[in-house]
Swiss-Prot record:
Residues 1-46 have a biased composition (Low complexity). This is Homeobox protein lin-39. Transcription factor. Binds to the consensus 5'-TGATNNAT(G/T)(G/A)-3' PBC/Hox motif of target genes to regulate gene expression; sem-2 in order to promote cell fate specification in the postembryonic mesoderm (also known as the M lineage), and egl-18 and elt-6 to regulate vulval development. May bind to the PBC/Hox motif as a heterodimer with homeobox protein ceh-20. Regulates vulval precursor cell (VPC) differentiation, in concert with orphan nuclear receptor nhr-25. Interacts with nhr-25. The gene is lin-39. Residues 165-224 bind DNA. Disruption phenotype: Lin-39 and mab-5 double mutants have reduced sex myoblast specification-specific expression of sem-2 in the developing mesoderm. RNAi-mediated knockdown in L1-stage larvae significantly reduces the fraction of unfused P5.p-P7.p cells that express egl-18 and elt-6. One of its GO terms (biological process) is positive regulation of mesodermal cell fate specification. It comes from Caenorhabditis elegans. A motif (Antp-type hexapeptide) lies at residues 148-153.
Length: 253
């Protein structure tokens, strides 16, 4: 019985020895990790460089050689911190360089809103134009017959067009009116051939000559309608059936 218990007592320390060695190794690794992190809990730049695989000095020298005087070597530490923060390693946060007043300047924001307001007005104006809403300028265009400039007068066709469209009155010159009056006193009604000749001689269209004669005949009828129809004065004995009265001569013998 004494011989069987002695080997088991000797084997127990041997079995517990690896456990103590593993615990000592884990404690040493944890102590090394805590020592590497440091008292502040933030890794140093050298440790970050070894972890990320980025050397600030090498990158700074390469960038200086490539860009020359345009590269600032002092920004290498900021680049390292940026890569550390992007990898989620909790690198040191550097303040943003430059003036931050522009980010919160109320005048800049108000100017931005003003520009947005003006752009909105332009969009509203475009919408109004699409909807057909007319303003003062549109009313002026309607009053002027849609002509913006004096030379943009609307000339209607003399041969056709819509019946509901009002035609522009033809402005006859003084010479044309004089020649038409002469022709009217000669002939109240013109034939087709004569109408074409008059239109060609006065540089007018056949329709213009026809309309002028129609208006002139209406004017002539109105003038004669207002006048009383009085017979002309005849001289005494001019149209009597008998000859002039003569006294007989008694002393002819």
């Amino acid at each position: 019985m004494t011989t069987s218990t002695s080997p088991s007592s000797t084997d127990a320390p041997r079995a517990t020895a690896p456990e103590s060695s593993s615990s000592s190794s884990s404690s040493s690794s944890s102590s090394s990790s805590t020592s590497s992190v440091g008292a502040s809990g933030i890794p140093s730049s050298s440790e970050l460089s070894s972890t990320i695989g980025y050397d600030p000095m090498t990158a700074s020298a390469a960038l200086s050689a490539h860009f020359g005087s345009y590269y600032d070597p002092t920004s290498s530490s900021q680049i390292a911190s940026y890569f550390a923060s992007s990898q989620g390693l909790g690198g040191p946060q550097y303040p943003i360089l430059g003036d931050q007043s522009l980010c919160y300047n109320p005048s800049v924001t108000s100017t931005h809103h003003d520009w947005k307001h003006l752009e909105g007005d332009d969009d509203d104006d475009k919408d109004d134009d699409k909807k057909g809403i007319s303003g003062d300028d549109d009313d002026m265009d309607k009053n002027s017959g849609g002509a913006v400039y004096p030379w943009m007068t609307r000339v209607h066709s003399t041969t056709g067009g819509s019946r509901g469209e009002k035609r522009q009155r033809t402005a006859y010159t003084r010479n044309q009116v004089l020649e038409l009056e002469k022709e009217f006193h000669t002939h109240k009604y013109l034939t087709r051939k004569r109408r074409i000749e008059v239109a060609h001689s006065l540089m007018l269209t056949e329709r213009q000559v026809k309309i002028w004669f129609q208006n002139r005949r209406m004017k002539h009828k109105k003038e004669n309608k207002d006048k009383p129809m009085t017979p002309p004065m005849m001289p005494f004995g001019a149209n009597l059936p008998f000859g002039p009265f003569r006294f007989p001569l008694f002393n002819q013998f």
